[in-house]
């Protein structure tokens, strides 16, 4: 019994416990406005904690940061644009990462039939895997939302 408990304790110590919130994720601006048919840029500001990095898209063997908007009939989502990533050497491999605060841009187009005076609420999920110089943590997700006033 003691041996089994010892192995269980060692297994817990050997694998990192999930630490939620390895990066601060904020929708910016939380409130936006545009006319029906207008293109609007929504932003996600991400600040990794010190010593933490998240992977940029294009690293085949790693989980990159992504933004996924919930389907919304009054909005068409465009392709997310990413800032230039840092190139880091991790485990003798050069990979694109974000280590400092950065901003993702999520373009949207309001439907031409959107009613002036209405508000469109958009919800999305930012998913990423945070790592430090020794280990990668389980993937994390953060919920973001914006209110878009139709002019």
Each predicted region: which residue ranges?
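Extracellular/lumen-exposed scaffold segments
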Residues: 12-151
């Amino acid at each position: 019994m003691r041996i089994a408990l010892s192995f269980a304790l060692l297994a817990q110590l050997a694998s990192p416990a999930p630490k939620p919130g390895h990066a601060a994720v904020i929708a910016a601006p939380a409130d936006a406005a545009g006319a029906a048919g207008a293109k609007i840029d929504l932003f996600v500001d991400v600040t990794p904690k010190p010593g933490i990095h998240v992977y940029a898209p294009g690293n085949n063997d790693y989980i990159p940061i992504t933004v996924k908007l919930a389907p919304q009939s009054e909005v068409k989502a465009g392709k997310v644009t990413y800032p230039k990533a840092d190139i880091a050497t991790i485990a003798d491999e050069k990979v694109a990462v974000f280590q400092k605060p950065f901003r993702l841009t999520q373009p949207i187009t309001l439907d031409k039939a959107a009613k002036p005076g209405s508000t469109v609420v958009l919800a999305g999920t930012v998913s990423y895997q945070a790592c430090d110089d020794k280990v990668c943590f389980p993937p994390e997700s953060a919920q973001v939302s914006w209110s878009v006033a139709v002019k």
